[in-house]
Amino acid sequence: MARQGTIHRVTGETDVKVRLDLDGSGQCQASTGVPFLDHMLHQISSHGLIDLEINAVGDTHIDDHHTNEDVGIAVGQALAQALGDRRGIHRFGHFVAPLDEALVQVALDCSGRPHLSYSLAIPSQRIGTYDTELVKEFFVAVVNNSGLTLHIRQLDGVNSHHIVEACFKAFARALRMATEVDPRRAGAIPSSKGVLEQAGAS
């Protein structure tokens, strides 16, 4: 069964289209109007071996906030759609990614229970034109719409670009670990309860 998600989200502020394939080869086409966000989406795709197609048009003449958040929402929704009932996956993932002096640890659980614990200390307010406050907002949006429990810890680093890129790389590798199919599960849901909550379920 294909583990894919397709989302088209339209608001008064943005128009976002996302296609995601968890069993891809790391192919990425990202055009959000926010260059640094595009760069980070490529990290998720390349290091998570997730095929991503993302196109967004937003009110970036105001700032990047709405586009950044709505791309995160759509990515989270596409991820939840691709995972379905999470049957047969490893469920948990973790990775520590270095990038020169920066070191960031990510641990996650495809639990269906949204939670973000975030402790990046990014020194500069901007990387290029990108407001570094938006890093957390992106992950808040992903978590709330995918049902991930996500912990992000900065262990070292002084260069803002290195810290953020290490974070996205660690997230990608942890996500790959968690979402890969575990052959020993034989298609069973990875929970002692026999069920995992699905994002968006009432």
From Swiss-Prot:
Coiled coil: none
Keyword Amino-acid biosynthesis recorded: yes
InterPro entries, A to Z: IGPD_sf, ImidazoleglycerolP_deHydtase, ImidazoleglycerP_deHydtase_CS, Ribosomal_Su5_D2-typ_SF
Major localization class: cytoplasm
Catalytic activity line of the entry: D-erythro-1-(imidazol-4-yl)glycerol 3-phosphate = 3-(imidazol-4-yl)-2-oxopropyl phosphate + H2O
Localization annotation: Cytoplasm
GO cellular component: cytoplasm
Pathway annotation from the record: Amino-acid biosynthesis; L-histidine biosynthesis; L-histidine from 5-phospho-alpha-D-ribose 1-diphosphate: step 6/9
GO terms of biological process kind: L-histidine biosynthetic process
NCBIfam families: PRK00951.1-3, PRK00951.1-5, PRK00951.2-1, PRK00951.2-4
Phosphoprotein in keyword set: no
Protein name in the entry: Imidazoleglycerol-phosphate dehydratase
GO molecular function, one term: imidazoleglycerol-phosphate dehydratase activity
The protein's Enzyme Commission number: 4.2.1.19
Assigned keywords, A-Z: Amino-acid biosynthesis, Cytoplasm, Histidine biosynthesis, Lyase
Family note: Belongs to the imidazoleglycerol-phosphate dehydratase family.
Broad enzyme group: lyase
